[in-house]
Curated annotation (Swiss-Prot):
Its cofactor is Zn(2+). It comes from Desulfitobacterium hafniense (strain DSM 10664 / DCB-2). Substrate binds at D93, S94, G95, G96, F97, D147, Q190, G217. GO terms for biological process: queuosine biosynthetic process; tRNA wobble guanine modification; tRNA-guanine transglycosylation. Homodimer. Within each dimer, one monomer is responsible for RNA recognition and catalysis, while the other monomer binds to the replacement base PreQ1. The lineage of its organism: Bacteria, Bacillati, Bacillota, Clostridia, Eubacteriales. This is Queuine tRNA-ribosyltransferase. Catalyzes the base-exchange of a guanine (G) residue with the queuine precursor 7-aminomethyl-7-deazaguanine (PreQ1) at position 34 (anticodon wobble position) in tRNAs with GU(N) anticodons (tRNA-Asp, -Asn, -His and -Tyr). Catalysis occurs through a double-displacement mechanism. The nucleophile active site attacks the C1' of nucleotide 34 to detach the guanine base from the RNA, forming a covalent enzyme-RNA intermediate. The proton acceptor active site deprotonates the incoming PreQ1, allowing a nucleophilic attack on the C1' of the ribose to form the product. Pathway: tRNA modification; tRNA-queuosine biosynthesis. It catalyses: 7-aminomethyl-7-carbaguanine + guanosine(34) in tRNA = 7-aminomethyl-7-carbaguanosine(34) in tRNA + guanine. GO terms for molecular function: metal ion binding; tRNA-guanosine(34) queuine transglycosylase activity.
Length: 372
C-alpha cells in the first residue's frame, strides 16, 4: 500500500497544513514528530509505552542496523516490526548522513561510500542499491533515498556536484525497488544554502513523482535563521499533495517554525538524548533537573504536563536518580520529553484547525522564553 498524505486543511495565514499520513502500519496525524529509535529501540522505552505516549511512527537507522545486528538477521526475524515488537509505522534513514557523521569516512565515489565502521573499524561499503536493499530487508514503511547530506558550509561548486550525485543516486534507489515498493521511497532535496541549487535539486527530485519528499542538508550546524530562510524558498517547490519531511529537526521552537513553513514530518534525537542526561523540555523552556536548584524541589517537572513522570515523581527524585546513574531516571525523563513533544504537536494541530497558529506561536515563544 502506498504511503500518502491526505491534506485536511491548509492554514489561511501560514503554509502550515493539517493532514493524515497513510502508511502500511497505520494512519498518523500530521504535523508529526517521530521519535528516533536508531538501533531498533527508542532508547529505554517499550513499544507499549511509546503507543501510550501517542507515538504512531518512529525512525530507525539503516547505517546502525546494517553494522549491527545486520539486515539479514532482521530479515530472518521477519523484519524490523517483528524484531522490535513495534506495530506502528517505521521510517528508516538511508545511512548517508550517519556515514558522514559517524563512520571514519574513507571515500565517496560515484559508486557509493567506503567507510570504516565506528564499531570495530572494519571496512564497509554503502551504495544506493545496498542502502535500498537493506531498508527493504528491514521492511520499513518509508524508505529514504541514499543521498549525500552536503556538509555545511559548502562551496557552490561542491554543493552543485553533490546534489547532482544525490539525484543520480536517487534514480538508482528507485531502480532497485519493485514498482510496488517504489511507493515507499522518499527523495531528499539538497543544494545546501544556495537558492538556485535548491531549485535545481527540487526540480530534479520531484520530476520522479515520489510518494514523499524530505528537505535534507539542514540542521547541520547552520544558524536557525538560515535554516528557516532555506525552508522559505524550498518548501514551496515541493508538491502540496505529498508529505514534506524536515530531517533532524528538532527543538520545540524549530518544530513550530517548520510547521509554519509547510513541513509535515520531523525527527530528532535531541529530546531523548537530553532526557538521558537530565534535561527536561517544558513549556517554560528547558529544565536541567540535575542542577542543584531541583535538589529540594518536590514539585513535578511541569505541573501542566499529563505524563506518567509528572503525575508521580518530583524534580528532587529525578535529580537523585540522574545523579545516581539510576536507569529509572533515564526512563522517566524520556517519558516526559516524548510526551511533551507529542502534546506540543497535538496543540499545533489544534491551532491549525482553529486558525490560530500564529497566536499559538506567539504565546508559546513568550512562555518558553524566546520572546523577551
Ligand atoms: C540532526 N540533523 C540532521 N539529521 C539529518 C539526517 C539526514 N539524512 C539524510 N539526508 C540529510 O540531508 C540529512 C540531514 C540531517 N540533518
Amino acid at each position: 500500500m502506498a504511503v500518502r498524505i491526505e491534506v485536511l486543511k491548509e492554514d489561511n495565514r501560514t503554509r502550515a497544513r493539517l493532514g493524515k499520513l497513510h502508511t502500511p502500519h497505520g494512519v498518523i496525524e500530521t504535523p508529526v514528530f517521530m521519535p528516533v529509535g536508531t538501533q531498533a529501540t527508542v532508547k529505554t522505552m517499550t513499544p507499549e509505552e511509546l503507543k501510550d505516549l501517542g507515538a504512531g511512527i518512529i525512525l530507525s537507522n539503516t547505517y546502525h542496523l546494517f553494522l549491527r545486528p545486520g539486515h539479514e538477521l532482521i530479515r530472518e526475524a521477519g523484519g524490523l516490526h517483528a524484531f522490535m515488537h513495534w506495530d506502528g509505522a517505521i521510517l528508516t534513514d538511508s545511512g548517508g548522513f550517519q556515514v558522514f557523521s559517524l563512520g571514519d569516512l574513507r571515500k565517496i565515489t560515484e559508486e557509493g561510500v567506503e567507510f570504516r565502521s565506528h564499531l570495530d573499524g572494519s571496512k564497509k561499503f554503502l551504495s544506493p542499491e545496498i542502502a535500498t536493499q537493506v531498508q527493504m530487508a528491514l521492511g520499513s514503511d518509508i524508505v529514504m533515498a541514499f543521498d549525500e547530506c552536503t556538509p555545511y558550509p559548502a562551496t557552490r561548486d561542491y554543493a552543485k556536484a553533490s546534489l547532482e550525485r544525490t539525484t543520480r543516486w536517487l534514480k538508482r534507489c528507485q531502480e532497485t525497488l519493485t514498482t510496488t515498493d517504489r511507493q515507499a521511497l522518499f527523495g531528499i532535496v539538497q543544494g545546501s544554502m544556495y537558492e538556485d541549487l535548491r531549485k535545481q535539486s527540487a526540480a530534479e527530485i520531484t520530476e520522479l513523482d515520489l510518494p514523499g519528499y524530505a528537505v535534507g542538508g539542514l540542521s547541520v550546524g547552520e544558524p536557525k535563521e538560515l535554516m528557516y530562510e532555506v525552508l522559505d524558498y524550498t518548501v514551496p517547490l515541493l508538491p502540496k499533495d505529498k508529505p514534506r519531511y524536515l530531517m533532524g529537526v528538532g527543538s520545540p521552537d524549530a518544530l513550530i517554525e517548520g510547521v509554519m513553513r509547510g513541513i509535515d514530518m520531523f525527527d530528532c534525537v535531541l529530546p531523548t538524548r537530553i532526557a538521558r542526561n537530565g534535561t527536561a523540555l517544558t513549556r517554560y523552556g528547558k529544565l536541567v533537573v540535575r542542577n542543584a536548584e531541583s535538589a529540594h524541589d518536590f514539585s513535578p517537572i511541569d505541573p501542566t504536563c499529563d505524563c506518567y513522570t509528572c503525575k508521580n515523581y518530583s524534580r528532587a527524585y529525578l535529580r537523585h536518580l540522574i545523579k545516581a546513574d539510576e536507569i529509572l531516571g533515564l526512563r522517566l525523563m524520556t517519558i516526559h520529553n516524548l510526551r511533551f513533544l507529542t502534546n506540543l504537536m497535538s496543540e499545533i494541530r489544534a491551532a491549525i484547525k482553529e486558525n490560530r497558529l500564529p497566536e499559538y506561536r506567539e504565546k508559546f515563544f513568550y512562555e518558553y522564553g524566546y520572546l523577551k
